[in-house]
Amino acid sequence: MTIENHCPCGSQKSYQNCCEALHLNVDSGAQVATSPEQLMRSRYCAFVLKNFDYIIKTHHVDFLGSLTLEQLKQGPNPNWLALEVLAANEETHPDGTLRGNVTFKAWYKLAGEIDAIYERSEFVFQQGRWYYTQGQQMHAKRPGRNDPCVCHSGKKFKQCCLTR
């Protein structure tokens, strides 16, 4: 998958017709994510493209903690393989806030090892925008050699990302 063909977020659209407008308009707000899933996909795409400014600006300030732009730039910087969205929803809470969550696996290769960030991410809608707040990490089972590859190439894992 190349950026010219498909957006890294897995939408099957071109980057220009998908996450690019969100990335370019993060400061102006001219175009913002319309759902927690769209924000999560655009954040994954930003990680792939090393657009760490977008990551910081779409992370709710109350949940940033000590995370900085410089820390993100320093790495680690894995080779991102694919994003798999497992579930997404949004709902209005009793206090009136609109919240959502997205469960996903973001597969990557780092130092020759394949692993995934398997997370249930939480989001909040404030001031006309969705923001990432926090996530609950889970353990991702690595695919077997004969399982379909995590990158959705249609090949077996052993014939694709396992050997890259």
Curated annotation (Swiss-Prot):
InterPro entries for this protein: NTF2-like_dom_sf (IPR032710), SEC_C_motif (IPR004027), UPF0225 (IPR023006), YchJ-like_M (IPR048469)
Domain of life the protein comes from: Bacteria
Protein name as it appears in the record: UPF0225 protein SO_2497
Protein species of origin: Shewanella oneidensis (strain ATCC 700550 / JCM 31522 / CIP 106686 / LMG 19005 / NCIMB 14063 / MR-1)
Entry's family note: Belongs to the UPF0225 family.
Pfam families: SEC-C, YchJ_M-like
Coiled-coil regions listed in the entry: none
